[in-house]
Regions:
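Domain-edge interaction signal
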Residues: 1-159
C-alpha cells in the first residue's frame, strides 16, 4: 500500500468507467480519497498508504512524485494502462463520485483544511511547500483520533 498504488488505482477506476482524469484531478482525488478512507479501509491501511506526504500548493495538496509522474500531460487527461490494487476497491464508489465533481470545486474544498488555512500566507505569498502531517490529512472520529495518537507514539518509541 502506497500513495503510488492509490494513484494507480484511481486512474484504473477512472479508465474502467470510461472517465477521463487529469493530473490536477488526480491530486485532489488522492487527497480526498485518503482523507475519508478510514471507514472504508481502516486506520492501519490509511497510515500505511500515506508513505509520502502531501505538500501545500496554491492548488491545494499534492503528492510530488505523482505530480511529476504525470506532469507531461499538462491539463490533458492521463492516458495509458493503469493498475488495479484490490486493497483499494472499497474506495471505488468515492473515487467515482469525486471524478464527477468540478476540479476547481475540489481545489477550493481542499483549501478548507485547517492545516492549509493556517499556512495560507506562506503558501500564497512565499510559495512554500509544507508537508502535511498525517493527522492533518485523515478525517477521524474521536476513537480513531486516539488510535492514531497511540500509533504515532508507539512508532516514536521504536525509533
Amino acid at each position: 500500500m502506497s500513495m503510488k498504488e492509490l494513484a494507480e488505482h484511481i486512474i484504473y477506476v477512472a479508465h474502467k468507467n470510461k472517465k477521463s482524469i487529469t493530473n490536477l484531478q488526480l491530486q485532489k482525488i488522492l487527497y480526498f480519497t485518503l482523507r475519508y478512507s478510514v471507514p472504508e479501509i481502516g486506520l492501519r491501511a490509511a497510515i500505511k498508504t500515506y508513505d509520502e506526504p502531501f505538500l501545500t500548493t496554491r492548488y491545494g495538496p499534492l503528492i510530488k512524485s505523482q505530480y511529476k509522474r504525470f506532469e507531461g500531460y499538462g491539463s490533458s487527461p492521463i492516458i495509458g494502462d493503469a493498475t488495479q490494487h484490490e486493497e483499494y476497491n472499497a474506495l471505488n464508489k468515492m473515487i467515482l463520485e469525486l471524478i464527477d465533481k468540478d476540479v476547481f470545486a475540489l481545489v477550493a474544498s481542499s483549501k478548507l483544511n485547517d492545516f492549509w488555512k493556517r499556512h495560507e500566507d506562506e503558501i500564497i505569498k512565499e510559495g512554500l511547500m509544507i508537508q502535511y502531517p498525517i493527522e492533518a490529512v485523515l478525517k477521524l472520529d474521536a476513537n480513531n483520533q486516539e488510535r492514531l495518537v497511540n500509533y504515532i507514539f508507539a512508532e516514536e518509541k521504536t525509533d
